[in-house]
Design a protein with these regions (language model features):
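Active-site-proximal cap/lid insertion segments
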Residues: 2, 13-26, 126-161, 169-320
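Short, structured active-site-proximal loop/turn typified by the sulfatase FGly-forming signature C/S-X-P-X-R
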Residues: 4, 20-56, 62-63, 92-96, ...
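Short, hydrophobic/glycine-enriched beta-strand segments
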Residues: 5-11
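Generic enzyme active-site microenvironment
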Residues: 10, 98, 276
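Membrane-proximal lumenal/periplasmic loop motifs of glycosylation machinery
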Residues: 45-51, 71-76, 216
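Generic structural signal for helix capping and beta-alpha/helix-loop junctions
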Residues: 52, 104-105, 283
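Short glycine- and hydrophobic/aromatic-rich loop-to-beta-strand nucleating segment
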Residues: 57-60, 304-306
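Catalytic-site neighborhoods of secreted/periplasmic enzymes
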Residues: 58-155
Length: 320
């Protein structure tokens, strides 16, 4: 490999059992399934902490969250902590970050300012996306109900715009060494995606885990507070888990990733490609939703696939 080229693709809130290649045939994820067939699929990959900012702080600094001020979503990295973009840029590697950042101490969407070490021409955090929208469009972009009321086009979504920038970067930097991050917010809520994706799961019931019947007895106080709004006190045996928007967005981001993989094959066929997610989602297991201060398998076990070493296999060892 004459040039050093690495493409790091990350999603948000994507469980391992939401990918076909991890043993869930009902999930329509052909792009990532293809990547798994061409690389190494890690069976026991775990996040350092199952919350967005802490998980990302570990990935992009190489430090544990408690060592770089990555304790919670509202924290920014310590001033004395260098991210991988800074370190690689100092070594002459063109580093670009496209997508959700969540490490600047701002709100969920970021500050819209390029972080140290990355190419400002390609910086595109979620604040940058919101600045492109009208006030009405901003509201629609954060409401799950928008998908029922309006014809959401692919071009309107954050995922599509991240993909377009990634493809542009790959085409224009085909002859250079680079480190490209493509960080999708999807399939994190509000699960915005075109109808053709969420309608694929209309009426589909996600497998019912036995631990969805757990009670809150003997659980710590924070667990009970977390479960307060979602705890199904009655008739939980009859509860049907039908997250069509979540699963639809899961297939949508796979579709967008597929376009990046195709561009990589054309413009950077020798690139190392790494794919993972920051954490999973409880999906009512243990009476909980989303993610948070717990170490349950549903939120700590993450997908991890690496292509670029001429190997096609699964790795059974624990990694993080």
């Amino acid at each position: 490999m004459d040039k050093k080229k690495v493409i790091f693709i990350m999603t948000d809130t994507q469980r391992t059992d939401m990918l076909g290649c991890y043993g869930h045939p009902d999930m329509k994820t052909p792009s990532l399934d293809r990547l798994a067939q061409e690389g190494i699929r890690f069976e026991k990959a775990y996040t350092t902490q199952p919350v967005c900012q802490p998980a990302r702080s570990a990935i992009f600094t190489g430090s544990y969250p408690h060592s770089c001020a990555g304790w919670s979503n509202c924290m920014g990295l310590s001033d004395n902590v260098q991210n991988i973009g800074r370190r690689l840029t100092d070594q002459g590697i063109h580093s670009a970050y496209i997508g959700k950042w969540h490490l600047d101490g701002g709100d969920y969407f970021g500050l819209g300012r390029c972080a140290d070490g990355w190419d400002p021409d390609y910086w595109y955090d979620m604040r940058c996306y919101l600045e492109e929208l009208t006030e009405e469009e901003r509201y629609l972009s954060r409401q799950t109900e928008s998908m029922e009321k309006y014809d959401i086009k692919e071009e309107f979504t954050y995922a599509h715009r991240c993909t377009a920038r990634a493809m542009d970067f790959l085409e224009k930097n085909r002859d250079d060494s680079f480190f490209l991050v493509v960080s999708y917010d999807e399939p994190h809520g509000p699960f915005l995606c075109p109808k053709e994706f969420w309608s694929m799961y209309d009426g589909y019931e996600f497998p019912h885990k036995a631990n969805m019947l757990d009670t809150l007895e003997d659980k710590p106080a924070h667990h009970k507070i977390w479960a307060k709004d979602t705890y199904m006190a009655a008739a939980r045996e009859d509860f049907k888990l039908q997250p069509k928007y979540y699963l639809g967005c899961n297939s949508f981001v796979d579709y967008e990733i597929g376009k990046v993989l195709d561009a990589a094959e054309e413009y950077a066929p020798d690139a190392i490609i790494i794919y993972t997610s920051d954490h999973g989602d409880m999906l009512y297991s243990h009476s909980l939703t989303s993610k948070g201060p717990a170490m349950y398998e549903e939120i700590t076990h993450i997908p991890l696939i690496i292509k670029g070493f001429g190997e096609n296999r699964t790795d059974p060892h624990p990694v993080s």
